Regions:
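Signal peptide-directed extracytoplasmic domains
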Residues: 3-106
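Well-ordered beta-sheet/strand-loop patches within structured domains
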Residues: 72, 76, 84-93, 105-106, ...
Length: 345
């Protein structure tokens, strides 16, 4: 008997021959013949007596089929049903305009579940039509998530000399660490965003600090990009997970506001603490880089950053605080973000 599998208006029919379906007639016959042929004579006499007295002994007629062939059939059906969930897309242009495309739910045939149902009806000799169990899969980024990104939570700019190899590196790093969506409770990693800053990725040799000395190294200048992103993250109220200061004070930002990076060693990481996604946007122009962090307008905070300097013989110690204000610009709370120690030149 055929097994019909249904989903919406489609029907897939499994014929017995498709899966080598058969009843184990020979096995059942052998069991019947051996019922009174055990190794124990007394037991054989008892069983024969019961049969003579019309006491029936039931021997189940079992069914069997090729599970590998069923797997192939179910896989083929899944290929016709399954559809990958598509996340909504979001792109923010340099002029602040939004480009959004809606998400699409996916479909996934629950293969193990339908194979078990088929196995059950075959074993129970209760062949019937079955509705295919299909699960709706949800994309990571839904339409409503994208729609919630509508405002700037924080932004920051720094200036640089565009006519240098260092300036070229800022352009490359700025592009690779931009246009990234961070979901709620996810952590942004600058090193993960840019990958290794090496020549094969378009970086050039430029001054870097190694062991307290300036030398030419691959990707010199990328710390200005991480620093710009860091300050935007501070003003956006994001949770700072990892940040490191330079050996010396930087020329492009005040003390306690820098974020040095070294691939495989030092990273800039921050977490999205909100219930809506955020979007990291870098705009690298001629002589300036601006980071804008977009999110839901409900998550906008009034924030400013302040620093405290302490000068010692060979060190400059700078404490960085983030201050939250209410609608009347009155301080709600203040948190220490980092304590930074710089060598004096």
């Amino acid at each position: 008997e055929d097994i019909n599998l249904k989903y919406n208006s489609k029907v897939w029919t499994i014929h017995p021959s498709d899966i080598d379906f058969r009843y184990k007639v020979k096995e059942a016959t052998n069991k019947a013949l051996s019922y009174t042929r055990t190794a124990k004579k007394l037991e054989n006499l008892k069983r024969k007596s019961k049969l003579i007295l019309n006491e029936r002994h039931h021997i189940a007629l079992e069914a069997t089929y090729d599970k590998d062939k069923l797997d192939v059939i179910i896989d083929c059906i899944a290929q016709q049903i399954d559809r990958e969930a598509l996340s909504a897309t979001l792109a923010i242009e340099n002029d602040g305009s939004f480009k959004k495309l809606p998400s699409k739910d996916g479909k996934e045939l629950q293969k193990d579940e339908i194979k078990k149902e088929i196995d059950d009806i075959i074993k129970n000799k209760n062949i019937m039509d079955l509705n295919l169990p299909v699960k709706t899969t949800i994309p990571k980024l839904k339409t409503e998530d994208v729609e919630s990104v509508n405002s700037i939570l924080g932004q920051f700019s720094t200036a640089f000399n565009n006519e240098t190899s260092r300036g070229s590196n800022i352009h490359v790093a700025g592009e690779s660490s931009s246009d990234i969506i961070i979901m709620p409770q996810e952590t942004y990693s600058y090193n993960n965003a840019t990958g290794p800053r090496v020549l094969s990725k378009g970086y050039k040799y430029a001054p870097v600090i190694v062991g307290g000395k300036y030398i030419n190294g691959e990707g010199g200048g990328v710390c200005q990009v991480s620093t710009t992103i860091y300050n935007a993250a501070l003003l956006a109220g994001l949770e700072i997970v990892e940040v490191h200061n330079h050996t010396y004070l930087s020329h492009y930002v005040s003390g306690g506001r820098d974020a040095t990076v070294a691939y495989g060693y030092y990273d800039l990481k921050f977490k999205n603490p909100y219930s809506h996604p955020i979007y990291i946007k870098n705009i690298v122009g001629d002589g300036a880089i601006t980071t804008k962090i977009y999110g839901c307008k409900d998550d906008i905070k009034r924030i400013y950053v302040r620093t405290e300097y302490e000068y010692k013989k060979q060190k400059i110690i700078v404490k960085t605080y983030r201050v939250y204000l209410d609608q009347n610009n009155q301080k709600i709370k203040e948190e220490l973000i980092s304590t930074n120690k710089y060598d004096q030149k």
